[in-house]
Regions:
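Catalytic cores of nucleotide-sugar-dependent glycosyltransferases that transfer UDP/GDP/TDP-activated
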Residues: 2-522
């Protein structure tokens, strides 16, 4: 085995006047800016063994927000639990782990090949790497090939990841370490909860849903290849197709989402993606909850190496320097008017059509719009046309650049986030940390993280007229320096660390484990 060093392995397996466009979500009579620390945790066993299973991790490979969570949350937990990450051995992972050593092996089953398990470390966290070159070492991204098409064998690839997690939990991977709890993330590893039950394991599983819209749907004929009998397939079949996400929801001991509001919204038909009845049942039985994501400590305007100039609550000059840098980078002229930013994938979910619809309004009122991102060709073309139509007011950077994105958060005055749905969202928290006020649709995690008139501005309906009224509020806010400064301070001081989220996850782990004990004794 070329990638792993062999070792001995056991044999056993306030708001300005006229704010009628504001969202009536949470009104507050005054601005608040309070620094907080995580509350006492209470009873938690620091030796709790948790296997955090993910299909991406920003240390190695990232396709979306899950990669950020998978890198940050285990780090926040590592001093308070024995947490280890399991991730597929993509090319990027193998290349980034020269010290990889063999610690176990998952035997073949049905159409799923045998895989080796290697171990490395990332940020002090043990990372278990599922090594199977035929499944994971190829070009493209974790989920799609170079042309943007789903890998044709994704069912087998992510069943292998799911099954590996279950085999490790059952103690049949030849490893000295065995988890007490599986923490599964999204559809690529959700099938692990089903495998656990089918294998007769007592290890509980927690499934975190980062986006219910992605469900891992595959032909029913794939069941035999995945080692799933016709009887077993019944519980994971969604409208005639195998659903990895449904498998996790049905068989996990608890399901949580990445915000409290999103957990509530997915129990209804509008955002339940066909699984709302199932999720409503979970909510009624106390098996559905929400925990808001945190953001990494590197998002600090006092120290961020990507910024043109640093700043803090007492020295704002650095924001102006970053604003000028963004204007130059996007070919926009010097302007003291408000700069609105879009830092997003250019896709329908993110409401880019709404952002484009307010471009004329922003330009006519003396503002500028800076857009960075890539995505759907139709939306990319619409954004490019806007920059040609308003060359002095709309600047576009196609694709993504981490340094420029951070400068946009640090230099822009407002961030447009008219998402049609948003399980949690990270951009609004990045913006707040850098004193950029989110203008957001009141949905999902945006409700939980943006306090209307305090740490940003909210609007209720995902339509252009509602966004236009909210943009008008933004212009009025910008023209009242004292209000703008107070809101920026409140946004920058909003608690958003992973330590806070980590504490909530540790509580949830204990809750899931405690609930399992009476069930086993029954």
């Amino acid at each position: 085995m070329s990638h792993l060093r062999q070792i001995a392995v056991p044999v056993a397996l306030p708001v300005p006047a006229g704010d009628e466009g504001g969202a009536r979500v949470r009104r507050t009579p005054r601005l608040r800016a309070v620094e907080t620390t995580p509350p006492p945790l209470g009873r938690v066993d620091p030796a709790r063994r948790v296997l955090f299973v993910t299909s991406e991790m920003a240390d190695y490979v990232k396709a979306g927000g899950l990669g950020d969570v998978a890198a940050a949350l285990p780090r926040a937990l590592r001093t308070r639990s024995d947490v280890r990450v399991l991730i597929p051995g993509y090319d990027e992972v193998i290349a980034g782990a020269p010290d990889l050593r063999l610690v176990g092996r998952v035997p073949a089953r049905a159409g799923i090949p045998a895989c080796d398990i290697g171990e490395t470390f990332a940020g002090g966290v043990p990372v278990l790497v599922l090594v199977c070159p035929g499944l994971f070492q190829r070009g493209g991204s974790p989920y799609v090939d170079g042309s943007g098409q789903d890998w044709s064998d994704n069912a087998v690839r992510f069943a292998a990841l799911s099954r590996a997690a279950a085999v490790i939990a059952c103690g049949n991977a030849g490893m000295e370490w065995q988890p007490e709890l599986l923490h599964l993330n999204d559809w690529p590893c959700a099938l692990a909860a089903a495998y656990l039950r089918w294998y007769g394991s007592d290890v509980p599983a927690l499934l975190t849903v980062h986006n219910l819209a992605y469900q891992g749907l595959f032909p029913l004929e794939d069941a035999a290849v995945l080692g799933v009998s016709p009887e077993q397939a019944e519980s994971i079949t969604f409208h005639g197709r195998l659903s990895f996400l449904q498998a996790g929801i049905v068989h996990a001991d608890h399901v949580n989402t990445v915000s409290v509001s999103y957990a509530r919204q997915i129990t209804g038909p509008e955002q339940g993606c066909g699984l709302d009845a199932l999720l409503s049942g979970h909510a009624a039985s106390g098996r559905l909850s929400g925990i808001v994501n945190g953001i990494d400590s590197s998002w600090d305007p006092r120290t961020d190496l990507h910024l043109s100039e640093h700043f803090d609550l007492h020295r704002w000059e650095g924001r102006v320097a970053n604003k000028r840098r963004v204007q130059r980078a996007l070919g926009l002229p010097h302007s003291d008017g408000p700069l609105f930013a879009v830092v997003s994938r250019l896709v329908h979910q993110k409401g880019l059509d709404l952002s484009c619809a307010v471009a004329h309004q922003i330009a006519a009122a003396g503002g500028q719009l800076a857009i960075i991102g890539g995505g759907e060709p139709r939306i990319e073309a619409e954004v490019a046309a806007l920059s040609r139509r308003f060359p002095s007011c709309v600047g576009v950077y196609p694709g993504f650049d981490e340094g420029l994105a951070r400068k946009m958060f640090a230099g822009a005055d407002f961030l447009l986030m008219p998402s049609r749905f948003e399980p949690c969202g990270l951009s609004q928290m990045y913006a707040q940390r850098f004193g950029c006020l989110p203008i957001a649709h009141a949905t999902g995690g945006l409700i939980d993280t943006v306090e209307d008139g305090v740490t940003g501005l909210l609007f209720n309906s995902a339509d252009a007229d509602s966004l236009r009224r909210c943009v008008q509020r933004a212009f009025r806010t910008y023209r009242i320096p004292g209000l703008l400064s107070a809101m920026r301070r409140a946004a920058m001081l909003r608690p958003s660390s992973w330590d806070l989220a980590g504490t909530e996850y540790l509580r949830l782990y204990e809750r899931v484990l405690d609930a399992r004990v009476p069930e086993l004794q029954a």
